[in-house]
Amino acid sequence: MIGLVGKKVGMTRIFTEDGVSIPVTVIEVEANRVTQVKDLANDGYRAVQVTTGVKKANRVTKPEAGHFAKAGVEAGRGLWEFRLAEGEEYTVGQSISVELFADVKKVDVTGTSKGKGFAGTVKRWNFRTQDATHGNSLSHRVPGSIGQNQTPGKVFKGKKMAGQMGNERVTVQSLDVVRVDAERNLLLVKGGVPGATGCDLIVKPAVKA
């Protein structure tokens, strides 16, 4: 089953009949329009390409305009692709709504996390700080040793150090689907999802469900 592209609206909470409060993220999933269908013969794999939302005409490049015109759909704010499983069929120009998730219990949500800028090891990797006193005057928040000796004589790849924090692709898995509101194109999932309000999100049925 393919996924859909939506927009993060924000967080709120809803109450069950028992009065239990459930924190939910509201995702607006406008109709996803099929712009291209890829097949084994021409592309070597089966996939469907979709767009959603709208883009100002003066922001659409000529190649994009041609691509959307060929598909017969309105220019959207981006292009996304989902692999097709055996038996799944879609046609160019088809519109896919949030009702796709009507019978789905759990989803995986992918987005771009909020950027935090250049961060030290304490903030970025939750390192412990060093002594506040007892002879320590300048090294309270430094990481300490980052390697060994002449052997191996290098810093290993992946070593946790200071650097850019956030603003990276993140996937949160197995979030419960609380409600599917097809009338208002809304999907409510339990808990938080990556990214700032208004960012694009890719919602797929959970792989571990």
Swiss-Prot record:
PROSITE patterns, A to Z: RIBOSOMAL_L3
A Gene Ontology term for the protein's cellular component: cytosolic large ribosomal subunit
Modified residues (N5-methylglutamine): 150
PTM info: Methylated by PrmB.
Keyword entries, A-Z: Methylation, Ribonucleoprotein, Ribosomal protein, RNA-binding, rRNA-binding
Entry GO MF terms: rRNA binding; structural constituent of ribosome
Top-level taxonomic group: Bacteria
InterPro entries: Ribosomal_uL3 (IPR000597), Ribosomal_uL3_bac/org-type (IPR019927), Ribosomal_uL3_CS (IPR019926), Transl_B-barrel_sf (IPR009000)
GO BP annotations listed: translation
PANTHER family per record: 50S RIBOSOMAL PROTEIN L3 (PTHR11229), LARGE RIBOSOMAL SUBUNIT PROTEIN UL3C (PTHR11229:SF16)
Subunit structure: Part of the 50S ribosomal subunit. Forms a cluster with proteins L14 and L19.
HAMAP family for this protein: Ribosomal_uL3_B
Protein family membership: Belongs to the universal ribosomal protein uL3 family.
Function: One of the primary rRNA binding proteins, it binds directly near the 3'-end of the 23S rRNA, where it nucleates assembly of the 50S subunit.
Record's protein name: Large ribosomal subunit protein uL3
Organism in which the protein naturally occurs: Salmonella arizonae (strain ATCC BAA-731 / CDC346-86 / RSK2980)
